[in-house]
Swiss-Prot record:
One of its GO terms (cellular component) is nucleus. The gene is PHO85. GO terms for biological process: DNA damage response; filamentous growth; G1/S transition of mitotic cell cycle; lipid homeostasis; negative regulation of calcium-mediated signaling; negative regulation of glycogen biosynthetic process; negative regulation of macroautophagy; negative regulation of phosphate metabolic process. Keywords: ATP-binding, Kinase, Nucleotide-binding, Serine/threonine-protein kinase, Transferase. When phosphate concentrations are high it phosphorylates the PHO4 transcription factor thus establishing repression. Residues 8-290 form the Protein kinase domain. This is Negative regulator of the PHO system. Disulfide bonds: none annotated.
């Protein structure tokens, strides 16, 4: 990786995280737009482990639904990761194009399909993302969705590695992680995908908890309070309590009335309480709800920005009416 910081021009600040600031930038050589993730290096602590992890994993993950890392520029006091530029994250996309955040179901279908493809590629390469949320899913103006921010991602060598349970933003955190499991599998990413799926349909977070316990209660209210009969071994988790209020599972149709029965079936398969009962990304992509997506290429027409589509349709209609107008032939 041979670039230098002078090769890129900062255009505007896009966001700021725990250890990095992200800018929209331009490659001075070819004019290409990029995202510049700048990490200030502490003279004593050196490069943050999250940055090292992100770089090492993203160099290995080459897929159409994962943001491309073009370059890494290392100077004395700063590390700059040069990524392909994406127009907005899913959260901002929902705010801009949704009906109070809720997206058209054709868009939901294409986005969740692309999300699952990205997840499957990660899992096939033995990588857990561990921080899937709308803010980390990036959309470009072609309607392509890509996984970004692999700062918390981990490679897993065997199915039951022991990891920290302080992963995944609270609202998208799987119940097994909330219950204190430190030995979990790729199924935690699947739960997050289910939460994102529901949020795209309704425009609202499915489980907007304020603390670990509140998050569990919100999940139980909808999915039912687990016990040894419904989830063998659940009582052995560190955060399990015998005095939880007993909730019965609710019908997801009441919460997401605009989603058809096949879509609800897929959502339910993603949001299984027991991690071993959750569908895999590969299985999910074979679900009948996706059968109409015959072409897996994300550049299908319905993946495009709805605003751009309406603009294009208006222009086409104007051109057609102009061609049909007898005045144009006089």
């Amino acid at each position: 990786m041979t670039g230098s910081s002078s090769q890129f021009q900062q255009l505007e600040k896009l966001g700021e995280g725990t250890y990095a600031t992200v800018y929209k930038g331009r490659n001075r050589t070819n004019g290409q737009l990029v995202a510049l993730k700048e990490i200030n290096l502490d003279s004593e602590e050196g490069t943050p482990s999250t940055a090292i992890r992100e770089i090492s994993l993203m160099k290995e993950l080459d897929h159409e639904n994962i943001v491309t890392l073009y370059d890494v520029i290392h100077t004395e006091n700063k590390l700059t990761l040069v990524f392909e530029f994406m127009d907005k994250d899913l959260k901002k996309y929902m705010e801009a194009h949704g009906n109070q955040g809720a997206l058209d179901l054709k868009i939901v279908k294409s986005f969740i399909f692309q999300l699952l493809k990205g997840i499957m590629f990660c899992h096939d390469n033995r990588v857990l993302h561990r921080d899937l949320k709308p803010q980390n899913l990036l959309i470009n103006n072609k309607g392509e969705l890509k996984l970004g921010d692999f700062g918390l991602a981990r490679a897993f060598g065997i199915p039951f590695n022991t990891f920290s349970n302080e992963v995944v933003t609270l609202w998208y955190r799987a119940p097994d992680v909330l219950l204190g499991s430190r030995a979990y599998t790729a199924s935690i990413d699947i739960w997050s995908a289910g939460c994102i799926f529901a949020e795209m349909c309704t425009g609202k977070p499915l489980f907007p908890g304020t603390s670990n316990d509140d998050q569990l209660i919100k999940i139980f209210r909808l999915m039912g309070t687990p016990n040894e009969r419904t989830w063998p071994g659940v009582s052995s988790y560190a955060n399990f309590k015998n005095n939880w209020q007993i909730f019965v599972p609710q019908d997801l149709r009441l919460l997401i009335p605009n989603l058809d029965s096949m879509g609800l079936n897929l959502l339910s398969s993603l949001l299984q309480m027991r991690p071993d009962a959750r569908i895999t990304a590969r299985q999910a992509l074979q679900h009948p709800w996706f059968h109409e997506i015959s072409n897996p290429n994300p550049l299908m027409q319905h993946l495009a920005d709805p605003y751009q589509q309406s603009q294009q349709q208006s222009q086409q209609q104007a051109q057609q009416s102009q061609q049909m107008d007898p005045q144009t032939y006089r």
